[in-house]
């Protein structure tokens, strides 16, 4: 499975596709623009539907539990969810600025918090912390235990909202991430201080893009 450096490792593929089962859930909006992955959790699969309900399927494609931790108004926003497992718990971030932790065995809520802006990256974790980027090009570090913020680092903002997820990896004691204008930034994983930053576009190209 994918690691903290977005590396899937070596894969073996024989060129054959075989149907092994069907997983049913309500149709997601804007399916062609979705870049979200199911979570493989203890021989089970965890995914979400268009109202933000989290569904856990067993290896026989049967629903083990289905839980929704959104209000009626939030469900109408069709939140899209990112997952990462941590022991028996699952950490979740979404596209309507919520992030929370649930028990992976029952689906019950451990804690839930709100960010100022929606999230637009996968979740990465390191020891007792996890990391995610929001639409304001801000990398945020939270405690896994209760979701409290350890630190945040805002990089240069843009005038548009990206349809593509920002990249985020962990290398040793660094968190390396990209933002909507193409800057790549490495920060210290404990303090959140910038170690180095690499712009991938000249300022003239960026200005032309938004004029």
Residue ranges and their predicted role:
Residues 98, 107-108:
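A structural signal for beta-strand and strand-to-loop patches characteristic of beta-rich domains
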Residues 31-51, 76-98, 113, 117-139, ...:
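Repeat-blade elements of multi-bladed beta-propeller folds
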Residues 1-34, 58, 62-75, 108-115, ...:
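Aromatic (tryptophan-biased) beta-strands that constitute blades/sheets of beta-rich domains
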Residues 56-57, 101, 141, 186:
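Conserved blade-register residue in beta-propeller folds
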Residues 58-59, 104, 144, 189:
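Inter-blade boundary loops/turns of WD-repeat beta-propellers
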Residues 183-188, 197-199:
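Surface loops at the rim/top face of extracytoplasmic beta-rich domains
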